[in-house]
């Protein structure tokens, strides 16, 4: 417990909260351009080829973003919308691409959980 004299000399430090998605600069989403679209393997014990894209954001950051859902149409120079949210088994992937906006089309033949994959209600 500090004395009054010690508290006068140097005040208590405020606890700084560190953001988990710094590239978004406090915005809910950011627009960006794909510079590379590729697959990476998850860490143990999982095994797959996860689809990711390297994206240059309007905030100037170059990030790795996960492409959710089955199948996609993204390639180099595709304009995408990026939101926060990490992928637990992919180290360094802290962002998701929003499906159904800009150049990223929604998932084909999706029936359930459609809003998360940019799919309109089927007729």
Curated annotation (Swiss-Prot):
Domain of life the protein comes from: Eukaryota
GO aspect biological process, one term: translation
Keywords: Chloroplast, Plastid, Ribonucleoprotein, Ribosomal protein, RNA-binding, rRNA-binding
Primary localisation category: plastid
Localization annotation: Plastid, Chloroplast
GO cellular component: chloroplast; small ribosomal subunit
Alphabetized GO MF terms: rRNA binding; structural constituent of ribosome
Family the entry assigns: Belongs to the universal ribosomal protein uS12 family.
HAMAP family: Ribosomal_uS12_B (MF_00403_B)
Function: With S4 and S5 plays an important role in translational accuracy. Located at the interface of the 30S and 50S subunits.
Subunit structure: Part of the 30S ribosomal subunit.
Protein name: Small ribosomal subunit protein uS12cz/uS12cy
Organism lineage: Eukaryota, Viridiplantae, Streptophyta, Embryophyta, Tracheophyta
Gene: rps12-A
């Amino acid at each position: 417990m500090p004395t009054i004299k010690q508290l006068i000399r140097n005040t208590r430090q405020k606890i700084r909260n560190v953001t988990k998605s710094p590239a978004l600069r406090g915005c809910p989403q950011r627009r960006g351009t794909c510079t590379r679209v590729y697959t990476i393997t998850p860490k143990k014990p999982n095994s797959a080829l996860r689809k990711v894209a390297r994206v240059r954001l309007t905030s100037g950051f170059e990030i790795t973003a996960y492409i959710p859902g089955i199948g996609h149409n993204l390639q180099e120079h595709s304009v995408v919308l990026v939101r926060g949210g990490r992928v637990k088994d992919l180290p360094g992937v802290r962002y998701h691409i929003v499906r159904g906006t800009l150049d990223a089309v929604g998932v084909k033949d999706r029936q359930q959980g459609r809003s998360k994959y940019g799919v309109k209600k089927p007729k």
